[in-house]
UniProtKB/Swiss-Prot annotation:
Family of the protein in this entry: Belongs to the TatB family.
HAMAP family according to UniProt: TatB (MF_00237)
Entry's localization field: Cell inner membrane
Entry keyword annotation includes Transport: yes
Subunit structure: The Tat system comprises two distinct complexes: a TatABC complex, containing multiple copies of TatA, TatB and TatC subunits, and a separate TatA complex, containing only TatA subunits. Substrates initially bind to the TatABC complex, which probably triggers association of the separate TatA complex to form the active translocon.
Main location: membrane
Official protein name in the record: Sec-independent protein translocase protein TatB
Positions of transmembrane segments: 2-22
Any one GO BP annotation for this protein: protein transport by the Tat complex
Composition bias, Pro residues: 100-119
Region (Disordered): 90-140
Lineage: Bacteria, Pseudomonadati, Pseudomonadota, Alphaproteobacteria, Hyphomonadales
Length: 140
């Protein structure tokens, strides 16, 4: 129904139309009025649908732009991946041409060579009690 018009107002309008138009032409007038209202509603629906299409198209344009931006960022990502692959290829080629040998393993220091018995200090002197010094004399 129309906003702000209740049943009593419609009844009053109907009575006024009956008096002004007359009972003979009132049904034809009501039918024409109904057809006009139907056409008006169809036009309003088409108008609303056109606005909805424009809004939907605007949203689609935004989505297309976002997709295009994502594709461009994916292009940059794929370019970075390609660059990393080329770098790996170059590094492997350089390593084949000039291999880097690992540093030689650290060797533990060699144990001291055994000295000949004449040059070596007496091994027994470390464990043996001190001998008497002939220069000092034996004062035991």
């Amino acid at each position: 129904m129309l906003p702000g018009i209740g049943f009593s107002e419609l009844l009053l309008i109907g009575l006024a139309a009956l008096i002004i138009i007359g009972p003979k032409d009132l049904p034809m007038m009501m039918r024409t009025l109904g057809q006009l209202m139907g056409k008006g509603r169809r036009m309003a629906r088409e108008f609303q649908a056109a606005f909805d299409d424009i809004a939907r198209q605007s949203e689609l344009d935004e989505l297309k732009k976002e997709i295009q931006d994502l594709r461009q960022s994916n292009t940059f990502k794929s370019a970075q991946d390609d660059l990393a692959a080329y770098e790996a290829d170059v590094n492997s080629a350089v390593m084949r041409e000039h291999p880097v040998s690992p540093p030689p393993p650290a060797t533990p220091p060699a144990p001291p060579a055994e000295l000949p018995p004449e040059a070596a200090p007496h091994a027994d002197s470390q464990n043996a009690p001190p001998e008497a010094d002939p220069a000092k004399g034996d004062r035991t």
